[in-house]
Amino acid sequence: MKPSFVISLTLCSISAAVGQEILSDPGTLGPALETIHLFYDQWLTGFTVSASGHIFVNYPPVFPNSINFTVGEIVNGREVPYPNLEINTPPGGRLNYSTNPPTSSNSEDHLIGVISVITDTEDRLWILDSGRVASTEGLAETAYGGPKLIGMHLTHNTIFKKILFDQTAVPADGYLNDVRIDLNPALTPSGQGVAYISDNSPEGRTAIVVVDLGSGAASRKLVGDPSISSHPGFVPFIWGEAVYSNSSSISHFSVGVDGIALSADGSTLYYCPAGGRSLYGIETKYLLDNSHNSDVLSRSQIQVLGDKGLSDGLETDSNNNIYGGNMEDNSIIKFNPKTGLVQPFVRDPRLSWTDTLSVATDGYLYFTENQLWRAPIYWGGIDRRVKPYAMFRVKLPDGGVKVSRPRRE
């Protein structure tokens, strides 16, 4: 065979190969994202959308000297303190330097370090104040008066409930993270409903805190259980990079129970550690049980629901679908409790750390992308976050909306 013919044949083969499309990941799936707001200033985590369309946002002081106010509202495209700047400004600052080491402010009448906000089925706003603030040495411990749950009437922006947590409910190194409200009057003697709160203490003192919204009585459940703890040796991979924490030269990503969500009828609490990929559930009747041996019984009733990817927050719609981020897949997943199936709901290259999700009465799932995994605590003190942070929304499937009907009355 002549060399010139061989060369011609080879070139034809290469040309055909180049012209043939190689299968690749499309990178997107599901409904298109709508951009709701871009955050160019303070770093956010939680938010909620009221029935009237008002959007409330919280900015936790988990990085030193990072915020001017810890709860805000988006008004005409601007973020303003909510309900005002005064309540967001503790006298003497957020840190108490009269103690050694410094502790977080203990002001009962001011917002210290809000980590979550949520609206209930009566369209009232609940503000969860962790009471913890970052110093240059790390997260300062709390003092009584800091950790609290505040209820706000949105009509007049006034406080109707304030529950302070002592250290039997929330230890000084606890970190209240997320909250869900069930207003079913049959759940407690007070008839005012219950709050379920995740405590993902960085020091490892994890728990689910159950609060009677009438009496303010609070109890810690499933303390330190493996299901609410970071999975040993867990390393997330986001945008092709392994993410470690900086507590030592090589430290795994150790974050305990974070996201929680109630089933539409309030009978089950779903939850997940951020330091893992598993989803868990437990019937709320076991969390509400304070009888002898109730702790042993509740631990035996934990449901292991399988892997759903790495998630931070969780959320429920009126069809009882459970939604959560899947950071390693640039996606949001949908879990169907009836079938036990987890499926991607939406994918987009802009997704990386889907922090908080909120289903609204308008039939949309709102969520925030805050680049937490690019924060200095994971990259040797180098801040790799690039503003703006973002809030998006997507239309829910099958007519899903915010859960609004009474639960189990």
Descriptions of predicted regions:
Residues 43, 70, 74-126, 130-137, ...:
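Blade-loop segments of beta-propeller domains
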Residues 40-51, 103-128, 133, 168-198, ...:
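Beta-rich, blade/repeat-based domains predominating
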Residues 60-62, 130, 200-203, 213, ...:
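Short loop/turn segments immediately following the C-termini of beta-strands
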Residues 32-36, 78-109, 157-174, 218-250, ...:
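Surface-exposed loop and turn segments in beta-propeller and other repeat-based domains
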Residues 356-409:
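Blade-level signature of beta-propeller repeat domains, shared across WD40, Kelch, NHL, RCC1
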Residues 30-69:
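Beta-strand-rich domains and repeat architectures in extracellular enzymes and scaffolds
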Residues 1-19:
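Fungal secretory targeting signals
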